[in-house]
Amino acid sequence: MAKNYYDITLALAGVCQAARLVQQLAHQGHCDSDALHVSLNSIIDLDPESTLAVFGGSEANLRLGLETLLGVLNTSSRQGLNAELTRYTLSLMVLERKLAASKGAMDTLGNRIAGLHRQLEHFDLQSETLLSAMAGIYVDVISPLGPRIQVTGSPAVLQSPQVQAKVRSALLAGIRAAVLWHQVGGGRLQLMFSRNRLVNQAKQILAHLTPEL
């Protein structure tokens, strides 16, 4: 069966978007708020109609992730910040495979996300309450699967409990996107052998987005 590289690229962009948000938060203490909302919302939607629906039904919602994906797949730019993004992206993929192999962790994750739905009836998605709850899910369910993702950035920034909660929430969104990536036919071998197809697909999607003003 032919693989759907459109869906695979969207899901991979979701992983890369989460990685970019983690990087922005760790270095600056803040990030692209709209992109964060899209990524966090993807955690909540467990019964989407399509891959694109996971990310709010609009390709533009993944602009940051698609641009990051092109940087990660550009092998000539594996220095500095791009090396960080590549490490985060690959680490999220490794953790997702460990999650998939643990039925207990998957069941717990589903139950905890159902709890987020109840909290959303009373609190906003980016409220401290929800961010703390999502960070707690990452710490309790994902981190023990190991190996832990080493987040690098400004030590002063990373000491902030609010930044820590956002970083862990973004990592949870990255895991969600990595789960989706495998569901639609993604796999690690594509990063080696189908790199050009992924790059071309990402460029095609970006090309017909309206330019940012």
UniProtKB/Swiss-Prot annotation:
Q: Which Gene3D superfamilies match?
A: HflD-like
The keyword Phosphoprotein appears for this protein: no
Query: What keywords appear on the UniProt entry?
Result: Cell inner membrane, Cell membrane, Cytoplasm, Membrane
Q: Which GO terms describe its cellular component?
A: cytoplasm; plasma membrane
Q: How is this protein situated with respect to the membrane?
A: Peripheral membrane protein
Which pairs are disulfide-linked?
Answer: none
Instruction: Please state the protein's primary subcellular location.
Output: cytoplasm
Where in the cell is the protein located? Answer: Cytoplasm; Cell inner membrane
The cross-references to Pfam families, in alphabetical order and at most eight, read: DUF489
Q: Which InterPro entries match?
A: HflD (IPR007451), HflD-like_sf (IPR035932)
**Which family, according to UniProt?**
Belongs to the HflD family.
Q: What is this protein identified as?
A: High frequency lysogenization protein HflD homolog
Instruction: Supply the source organism for this entry.
Output: Klebsiella pneumoniae subsp. pneumoniae (strain ATCC 700721 / MGH 78578)
Its lineage reads: Bacteria, Pseudomonadati, Pseudomonadota, Gammaproteobacteria, Enterobacterales
